[in-house]
């Protein structure tokens, strides 16, 4: 990666901050902005240049990364009052790493193209640990030429980098992946409660299913660490999983694709959020079934 390149980073939360820090470790200039002053201070301490608003970041940068909570915020940051697109010079590349719908990305890409700006979707998988270690999986939607331009920068913050297609394709892959994760997690919770109701021990199911056709990433990643321990702090928040299922339903509606299993999983996670579990790991959805049935699985009981 060329050290002379100027990077902008907007959105320095749990994911954005470690990604920006990894870029700084490579010796490039990073212009940073976040509404939370503490987040900006954390990257300034690592050598970043603080900017007072989004436009200042845009005007100073060759490539601008954004990592934001949802599509509404992304669109406001890009095209609202004082937005990024009003201050970018032609030839700038914007790389949005947020989890949003392909339709939102395509809308922003169209506006950007009218100004001579390339707009890329590059959602990630790997969580905060992957962001800190620089080992994220990155799913990129962009033209071949733009992908080649940004790939050296992406390689600093990610390990497995996939050019999956044109603009919007990265968001689509992320949505499909998280649809499967959500449905698998809801099914796992349901199955474990049934097993305990039938007299099985959680440990027995974990061992046997883990070696059988019913095994899944949801079981491998969530069973021992969260469900068996009964500690659901940290991890991938239920609120975020619920949001991603909503994005899948939105894409299905736009494409006339029925998604009945996704709709049901969404309602199950909604039940968990109604119980106040939104900030716990998504595997806390098992508490919905425990409450309905009077069966205890979590905590190895």
From Swiss-Prot:
Q: Please name the InterPro entries in this protein's record.
A: 3-OH-isobutyrate_DH-rel_CS, 6-PGluconate_DH-like_C_sf, 6PGD_dom2, 6PGDH_NADP-bd, HIBADH-like_NADP-bd, HIBADH-related, NAD(P)-bd_dom_sf
* Pfam family of the protein (one): NAD_binding_2
The catalytic site is made up of 174
What pathway annotation does it carry?
Answer: Cofactor degradation; nicotinate degradation; propanoate and pyruvate from 6-hydroxynicotinate: step 3/8
**The protein's enzyme class:** oxidoreductase
Q: What is its EC number?
A: 1.1.1.291
Please give the start and end residues of each transmembrane region: none
Source domain of life is Bacteria
Q: Which UniProt keywords apply?
A: NAD, Oxidoreductase
Per the UniProt entry, what is one GO biological process?
Answer: nicotinate catabolic process
Report if keyword Glycosyltransferase is assigned. Answer: no
For the ligand (NAD(+)), the binding residues are: 8-22, 99, 243
Which reaction is this enzyme known to catalyze?
A: (S)-2-hydroxymethylglutarate + NAD(+) = 2-formylglutarate + NADH + H(+)
The region annotated as signal peptide is none
Q: Gene3D superfamilies per the record? A: N-(1-d-carboxylethyl)-l-norvaline Dehydrogenase, domain 2 (1.10.1040.10), NAD(P)-binding Rossmann-like Domain (3.40.50.720)
Q: Name one GO molecular function term.
A: NAD binding
Instruction: Describe its assembly.
Output: Homotetramer.
Which PANTHER family does UniProt cross-reference here? 3-HYDROXYISOBUTYRATE DEHYDROGENASE, MITOCHONDRIAL, 3-HYDROXYISOBUTYRATE DEHYDROGENASE-RELATED
Q: Which family does it belong to?
A: Belongs to the HIBADH-related family.
What the protein does? Answer: Catalyzes the conversion of 2-formylglutarate to (S)-2-hydroxymethylglutarate. Has very low activity with (S)-3-hydroxyisobutyrate.
- Protein's name in the database: 2-(hydroxymethyl)glutarate dehydrogenase
Q: Which gene encodes it?
A: Hgd
């Amino acid at each position: 990666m060329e050290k002379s390149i100027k990077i902008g980073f907007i959105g320095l939360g749990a994911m954005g901050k470690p990604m920006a820090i990894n870029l700084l470790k490579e010796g490039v200039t990073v212009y940073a902005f976040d509404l939370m002053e503490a987040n900006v201070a954390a990257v300034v301490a690592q050598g970043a240049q603080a900017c007072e608003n989004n436009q200042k970041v845009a005007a100073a940068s060759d490539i601008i990364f954004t990592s934001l909570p949802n599509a509404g915020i992304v669109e406001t940051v890009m095209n609202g009052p004082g937005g990024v697109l009003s201050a970018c010079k032609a030839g700038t590349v914007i790389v949005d790493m947020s989890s949003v719908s392909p339709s939102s990305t395509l809308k922003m890409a169209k506006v950007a193209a009218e100004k001579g700006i390339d707009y890329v979707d590059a959602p990630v998988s790997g969580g905060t640990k992957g962001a800190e270690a620089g080992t994220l999986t990155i799913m990129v939607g962009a033209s071949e030429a733009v992908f080649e331009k940004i790939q050296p920068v992406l390689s600093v913050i990610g390990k497995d980098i996939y050019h999956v297609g044109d603009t919007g394709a990265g968001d689509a892959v992320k949505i499909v992946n998280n649809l499967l994760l959500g449905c698998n997690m809801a099914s796992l919770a349901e199955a474990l409660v049934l097993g305990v109701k039938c007299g099985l021990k959680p440990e027995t199911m974990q061992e046997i299913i883990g070696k059988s056709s019913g095994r899944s990433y949801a079981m491998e990643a969530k069973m021992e660490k969260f469900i068996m321990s009964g500690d659901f702090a940290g991890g991938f928040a239920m609120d975020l999983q619920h949001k991603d299922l909503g994005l899948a339903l939105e894409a299905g509606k736009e494409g006339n694709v029925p998604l009945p299993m996704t709709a049901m999983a969404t309602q199950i996670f909604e039940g968990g959020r109604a119980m106040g579990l939104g900030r716990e790991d998504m595997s806390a959805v098992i508490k919905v079934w425990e409450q309905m049935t009077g069966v205890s699985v979590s905590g190895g009981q």
